[in-house]
């Protein structure tokens, strides 16, 4: 209060009414709550082999996996790492871990050994489920009594086969009492700054997030039991895990799983299985809009195309509409720490609303958002850009073993600060303007500058370094480095030094040699200055 006048707080809610959410249920109980209605309908389909499991089979195997995990000694609250590409077994183990009262941390199988070890150790993983091809990356972890299970037909020496889980006796699963605030998923995110951190998502949080999308008389994201949902985005990413797999399980829709994206294969599967919903990301949109082969396939079954993970330009939106004239197209918006969905396009609702091109939707139900002035911290009215914050039951519990970063992200009033600059127009639609946060988005994947900077300055010929995003037509953004040399070193040597230690999307694309890295008096890198230099090049 200043001068006796109370400041107005501008809060925004969904156009849809709040709903009752069964947030007392564990995640698996919630997702399978209506399984009797869909028991014999297709639930999981492997696009490569046509292997199909119905809902009753998936629910049963989830209980078998829970029993198998218990038999292997995994206790309630302990961690399983899924180091897998998209596959049916991913869903089995994720849901089975929920039944066991365990926690799943997901990791990109293309990570280098050091990246996997760092996450597995930070998360406290006791069991890793993976492919035989990736086992050699886990030698260090196996020497520390981490059990490795492979889903391949012939497990490597020292590993167990997935059948120890999927063929266990489901009646032998010990009963566990799961509290709504217990953690069920532990994806890793770089947050608004710094190194990757474990995001604690609870049963209550994920149940709330799924409900905000697909529950209610007028679901914001209308999935039904006749739908076939394309699952081409990686399940180790929370967007696909939540808005595809979990939402489909809850709604009784079939999930068609592709291990990796290939445009021709994708179009063949859309035609063969009459895919109705296609969640994608901007790089896939780019492939679709630039390829002439789309017209050779019948894609008329597609009724929804939803894009997330990174902003999409109006030109790409328009080009996509030309290729899929019968589909409703729109964007959502989220971040891992928000569970991940903050906003969803109301064009996807059962009773849809008109939406504007370029909008990433309106805030989900049962939540509030506000826009804060990035200088003063005051909440802003419509049509003024500032940092978007969200408060609701779906947001993370916090970062694991990192109270400092948690406090910097979720304030005392429960608001999650996203680090994204956006505005809300008069129709409550959200538009992304910029990012306050430092994270680089390469094809939707997160790249933390601090992680690459730590690698760079570890080189004896590099005195100082800073990493910032540079715009790129296909990837959206790529990491580029500004480097201060302490002795002679070439751009190529620096690129190779980093590439040996990181996954493909973290590779440095350009190196600019400078005399000094601009920093604030407190020593913080002035990334805006470096981005301005790039813009001027």
From Swiss-Prot:
Which cofactor is essential here?
Mg(2+)
Annotated catalysed reactions: (E)-4-coumarate + ATP + CoA = (E)-4-coumaroyl-CoA + AMP + diphosphate; (E)-4-coumarate + ATP + H(+) = (E)-4-coumaroyl-AMP + diphosphate; (E)-4-coumaroyl-AMP + CoA = (E)-4-coumaroyl-CoA + AMP + H(+)
Which positions bind ATP?
189-193, 197, 331-332, 336, 420, 435, 524
GO terms in the biological process aspect are: phenylpropanoid metabolic process
**One Pfam family hit:** AMP-binding_C
Keyword terms of this UniProt record: ATP-binding, Ligase, Magnesium, Nucleotide-binding, Phenylpropanoid metabolism
Q: In which pathway does it act?
A: Phytoalexin biosynthesis; 3,4',5-trihydroxystilbene biosynthesis; 3,4',5-trihydroxystilbene from trans-4-coumarate: step 1/2
Q: Could you tell me which residues belong to the region SBD2?
A: 332-399
Cite the binding residues for (E)-4-coumaroyl-AMP. Answer: 239, 243, 309, 331-332, 336, 344, 437, 441
The record ties this protein, via InterPro entries, to: AMP-bd_C, AMP-bd_C_sf, AMP-binding_CS, AMP-dep_synth/lig_dom, ANL_N_sf
Q: Where does CoA bind?
A: 260, 443-444
Q: Which domain of life is it from?
A: Eukaryota
Residue ranges for the region (SBD1) are 262-331
Q: What is known of its domains?
A: Both substrate-binding domains (SBD1 and SBD2) are involved in the substrate recognition, and are sufficient to confer the substrate specificity.
Q: Which family does it belong to?
A: Belongs to the ATP-dependent AMP-binding enzyme family.
Q: What does the record give as the function of this protein?
A: Carboxylate--CoA ligase that may use 4-coumarate as substrate. Follows a two-step reaction mechanism, wherein the carboxylate substrate first undergoes adenylation by ATP, followed by a thioesterification in the presence of CoA to yield the final CoA thioester.
Name of the protein in question: 4-coumarate--CoA ligase
> What organism is listed for this UniProt entry?
Pinus taeda (Loblolly pine)
Q: What is the primary gene name for this protein? A: 4CL
